[in-house]
Amino acid sequence: MTSAILLVSKNRRKQLNDQVFQQAIALAFCSISVLVNTGIANQTVLAQPPKQQKCDIYAYVITKEPQGLNVRSGASPTHRILGKIATNETVKIVAASGKWVKITDITGDFKGTGWVYLPMLSISSRGYGTDGVNIYSNANQKSQKIGKVPPSTSVKLLGCQGEWAQVEYQGIKGWLASEDQCGAALTSCS
């Protein structure tokens, strides 16, 4: 009798273990499904390109590539190359999306509109005959003045917003007003 009880008990334990195992598998699949679906949803959101910022500034090409700067059909290095722009050519920036800017009004051989990698462009300060131009903390002249750029000095271009250029000069990151910008490499714009 005891061996019959033990056998029933072992069988019952096996059934319970099987049920627990099946429930654990079902729970694991549900958890994986939730994680995968949430991950896919998050990836879809993350895969969207950065929002475009409208701009209206001029800059010049500073690439060291002998063939010039690639102009692309979209805001990434995977987009088709439409043409090239030589170093020191002036371009008009009409939009920005992350580290890419949409350009037009190009002074060189390439005519049309396209996208270029922002770190390959620069601007200079105006202010000829003054002690320099102000760098502002935000894209408006009522914001705090956080630094100065000497006249006719090349600065690193970080971005743009309307007619304002986001720049970096000697570690100071801020904004240059449109009247303080020079988008031509070989002139002081005075």
Regions found by a protein language model. Name each.
Residues 1-20:
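N-terminal secretory signal peptides that target proteins for export/translocation
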Residues 26-73, 84-87, 93-97, 105-107, ...:
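SH3-family beta-barrel domains
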Residues 75-80, 139-144:
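Short alpha-helix capping/helix-loop boundary micro-motifs
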Residues 77-78, 109-111, 173-174:
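Short, surface-exposed beta-strand-loop junctions and turns on beta-sheet-rich folds
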Residues 166, 175-176:
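Structural recognition of the beta-strand scaffold that forms the well-ordered cores
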